[in-house]
Each structure stands twice: as C-alpha cells, then as structure tokens.
Amino acid sequence: MVSTDLPPLIELRGIRKRYGGGDKPEVEVLHGIDLDIRAGEFIAIVGSSGSGKSTLMHLLGCLDRPSSGSYRFAGEDVSTFGSDELAWLRRKAFGFVFQGYHLIPTESARENVEIPAIYAGLPPGERMQRAADLLGRLGLSDKLNNRPNQLSGGQQQRVSIARALMNGGHIILADEPTGALDSRSGAEVMELLRELAGAGHTVILITHDRDVAAQAQRVVEIRDGRIVADSVTDRQPSEQPLLHHAGLSSLEMTQAHEDTGTPFWQGLHETIRAAWRVMWIHRVRTSLTLLGIVIGVASVIVMLAIGEGTKQRVIDQMGSMGTTIMYMSSDVPSTGGPVGVITEEDLDEVARLPEISRVMPVIGDPILVRHQNVDKQIYVFSSPYIMPMVHHWRVAQGRFFTETEDRELAPVVVLGHKIYRSFFPHLSNPVGQYLLIGTSPFEVIGVMAERGAESGSQNYDDMVFIPYRAGRARVYQAQEQPDYIVMEAASMDQVQEAEEAIRALLLERHGREDFRIGNAAARLKTQLETRDTMTRMLGLVAAVSLLVGGIGVMNVMLMTVRERTREIGIRMATGAREYDILSQFLIEAMLVTITGGTVGVILGLTVGALLVFWEVPVVFSFGVMIGAFACAVITGLIFGYMPARTAARLDPVVALSSE
C-alpha cells in the first residue's frame, strides 16, 4: 500500500465544472470535488454514465480546466498554467489509455508509440528503439509496422499502453480501457495496469464496471458530480517483472515554466514525413489541390516568358534595323493645305547635315510577281544600293545590287528568304533565275539572310528588293515622290540632334511643317511600353490563377482539419503544444504548395520548350521562376495559416470526442 504520510501528488479542492453560459443554459456537472491521489496509487474512479467521471478524468489529465476550485499537482497550482505548460505536464507526467484506443490510423504501431517522444524532443534513433522495446515487452514485437486496422482490439490497446509509457508515464489515466474488449483481452489489459502499478506508476482507472474497479487498491465512487464513497480494497499490485523498468524519472515541476518544447528543426523531418504520408493516402484530392498551384505557377512562368520573349524580339528587330535610324515622310500641314512634297534636292541637303551619315529614299507596294506558273502578290521594296548597310543586313547568297546598277536602272532583284523558299523550294542557289515583277523581267542576283519582321511592320523575309531608280522607271510608273525616307544618324547620341536639324532645314526650305519625322528609338520605346503592359496583364491573369489555387489549398486544409480533429486531440493528449499543431498543418499546406510549385516550374519549362519548338518567342527568367515558386510557398503559408490556427485552437476534449 502507498503510505498516507506522503504528500499528495494530485490534490483537488472544491473542483466545479460548468458548461454553457451566455445565451445557453449553464449546467454544472461537477459539484465541489475534493480528492487526493498519492504517487504510486492504483485508484479506480467508478460511476454510471453521466456521473461526471469522464469530466473528472479530463480535469485530472489537464485536458480541460475546472470552472472553479483548486488543482495542485506536485505542489504546483495547475490553474495558473498556460496552454504550453499544460502540454508539458501531459507530455511529461501523464499517459492516456482510452476506451476507443485513439490511435492515428495513418501511422504504424511503432510510429503511434513514438508520438509523445517526438514532442518531448527525443532523438529519432533513441525514440524508435524505445518504442520497439516497449512494444516488445507488451508482446507486439512482430507488429511494429502494422497499422491500427491490422491489429485486434487487444493489440491496439497494448499499443495505447505503450504510447502512455513512452515518456515515462508517471501517471496512467485509463478511461474504460476494457470497455471495447472481449473478456480475455480485458483481463490481459487489467493485468498490465496492475503490473504498472507494481512498477511504481500511479494508475487512475475510470470505469463504470464495479468488478473492474475492484481490481484497484482504492475505489472512489462518483455519482451526479459528487464523490459519494472512497474506500480501500485488499488488492495488491502485480509484482511481475515485465514492466519494472518502464523508464520512470523524477519530475521537476520548475521545467513546466522553462521548457520551450521541441525545437522547430528537430521535429521538422517527422512533420514532413507525416504530412507526405497524409498527402499520399489522399493522393487524388491532393492532386486536384496541386492542380491549382501547378497551373498558377506554370502560367506565371510561361506568360511572363512569352512577354519577355516578345519584348526581346522587338528589341532585337529594332536593334538590327539600327537604333540610329530615323524615318521621314510627307504629311498634311497642321495649318491645312496640300500634302507636302519632299524633293531630291531636299534629300541632298539633308545628306549634307553633319549629324546624318546616310539617306535612303524608299518606294514600296504589293506587286504581282511571277516565276513560271507561280505568281504571288509580293511587297516590292525599291531602294538605293545602301539598304544592307543602313539596316545592318547581310546577303546570304549572291550579292546586293551596286551603285552603278542603281544609276543605270539595271533590272536586278534580291530575294527575301521566304520568297526564295516560296519560288525556288528545290533550288539551292536561285542566282541567275528570272522573276516577272509587274510586267518587267528582273534577274535574281542574291538572297538576303533570314531576318523576320520589324515589330509593327511587314515581314522583311516576304519582300523582294530592287534598285530605287529601276523601281521608279520599270515598276512604279515613274513615281517621283518616295513613300518614305530612311535616314541614319552619325551616332546614337546624335539622333535627337539630327531630328531637330532635319526639321529646322525643311522648315526653312518649305516654310511650313508638311513632313513627319520619327526615329527607331522612339518606336522602340513605344513598342516596349506596349509589350510591358501586355506582360503585366498576362502576369496579372497568372497571379489570379495562383490566388485561386491558394484558396483551393485553404479549402482542402479546412476539410483536412475537420477530418483529422480526433488526431489533433490525440496529439494534444500526448503533449503537443498549440505551436506544434499550428506548425504541423502549416507545413502540410506549404508541402502541398512546394510540391505544386516544383511541378509548376517543370510544367512551365516544358510548355516553354514546346513554344520554342513552335517558334514562339520565349525568354525564361530565373528570377521569375524563383519568384513564382516563392509566391506558391507564401500562398501556402498565408492560406494555410487559418486552417492551421483553427486546428491549434481546438479544445482537446472536444477534439478527442469527435468522430
């Protein structure tokens, strides 16, 4: 028997527990309970259904708080403890054995037993060995990796007892431990509890069965929320050596106020493992949740890559045309009057300006071009011999026409790359062939290198190029006025000065501004601003899809919290702090988004590679990929916080009683 001279380990004075209040009727289920329990006692609290025994057990195990009264544990007033201090007490002092076993269905027997040690910060190797040893002593050495649904009721209750002993189990709280078992399994469980009492554990047995209660050393009867009897039996605890070395250690209550729990990094691996297992078990739902994040991340990457690729193509095209290029054409004066006329004399004067290096008049129009039985409407570009130099464009085959050929109206033509492929698909070198342009035959003397379209203009590869004077005389019916003039500034720094000098010169010669001047740099700026706007719009659409994915994560996590409410209660009963539950569900949400973000990046790169294959301009940015991935993770953090916070704030008693 336990000496009554010892100070009580647990001391209850005037404990009352009320439920309801506010707009609901208040109900008191415990009415001034006074109870002392000493270390090493094997005590049974017996009562019928509704007597208040389960409520008393919840208060004893620090799963709930009394409405009034005093609860002292090892001399400390528990009513002053915060939630983390109560979690420490459950983790270090108590071990729970429930009627419904309360094992986490996704974990193996050993993993269920390890749970209290995870929150106690025990190293993985030591934790696994201790769990295996406890299960071995309880006759379950061959069931370490079995899930709860692969165990009998008696075996599940043994796992529950092993879990209660994992952190030492100074006090074993057994709530109807034989209620769901057959008589044989029930007898085995009671024998184990007697052995625990004999090994020095304090065992508190909650039961409605007086025969079961009679196996304890002390029986306390509770009825209608009051203790009506407290008697001592003649039963002695079992002296079997099975659990003599269960790992009891002294409790230092001062640690309750100092212990900060398991460091985040130490339990991270276990949390990720558990989260990954839950994701795998619910893989269809997880996949559908991931889909929103995957599409969002991939959309951001692909859309911004297309925007950047298009922007880069504009820069390359405009750059290849020359950022020192300016364009001039006739215009209607702002004051009214006829369209201005730019003469050759005007061009000669412009060419003499020191800020100008080249002047190139251009006439161009779609003309019917024929070769044998193939004819096409093609843009015929008529310009002086300096065109390749002005536009920084090389000849791929043959040559470009010369100044002499231009001056002598030579009927020669240079083909754009696509025109060459269109008219001569099977000919490796078309030089020497003839095309009929309008009604005039022209000899092919060269093919330009592939170039593409200048943004906002016709594709240069779809053109043919003829001398300026030959074009005026042979194709454009002696047209005197050029359609527009291309001018090249002496340097990029002089573009603005050159434009002002041309404007001043022509104003002096014409007396009015009947012309229009633009430069490639201004066009480039306009084009880039347009592309940037489009890119921002594309990015916004992609960001919205990522936001929708985040909302999907939140919905699924809220559903997960509801489905796993009992698991949350089990973890709290085994010593998890609010922070532990919060971090667990936050990590689960982030793991979903990290996985989705990773798959999204891979999908985005894959789609981008296909777009490149289809010749769509795409430029991937490592920064965009990192940003999209980071946004996915932050989305998981933000949208996972509310479900995680909901889980962390659950009442342990309510959580344990959920179905």
UniProtKB/Swiss-Prot annotation:
Compartment(s) of residence: Cell inner membrane
Keywords: Antibiotic resistance, ATP-binding, Cell inner membrane, Cell membrane, Membrane, Nucleotide-binding, Translocase, Transmembrane, Transmembrane helix, Transport
CDD domains, alphabetized: ABC_MJ0796_LolCDE_FtsE
Pfam families: ABC_tran (PF00005), FtsX (PF02687), MacB_PCD (PF12704)
Superkingdom: Bacteria
One GO location term (cellular component): plasma membrane
Enzyme Commission code: 7.6.2.-
Keyword Ion transport on entry: no
Gene Ontology annotations of biological process type: response to antibiotic
Domain ABC transporter residues, every copy: 10-249
Positions that bind ATP: 47-54
Main location: membrane
Membrane topology of this protein: Multi-pass membrane protein
One example GO MF annotation: transmembrane transporter activity
UniProt-listed InterPro entries: AAA+_ATPase, ABC3_permease_C, ABC_transporter-like_ATP-bd, ABC_transporter-like_CS, MacB-like_ATP-bd, MacB_PCD, Macrolide_Exporter_MacB, P-loop_NTPase
Catalytic class of the enzyme: translocase
TM stretches of this protein: 287-307, 538-558, 594-614, 619-639
Protein family (similarity comment): Belongs to the ABC transporter superfamily. Macrolide exporter (TC 3.A.1.122) family.
Subunit structure, interactors included: Homodimer.
Biological function: Non-canonical ABC transporter that contains transmembrane domains (TMD), which form a pore in the inner membrane, and an ATP-binding domain (NBD), which is responsible for energy generation. Confers resistance against macrolides.
Protein name, entry field: Macrolide export ATP-binding/permease protein MacB
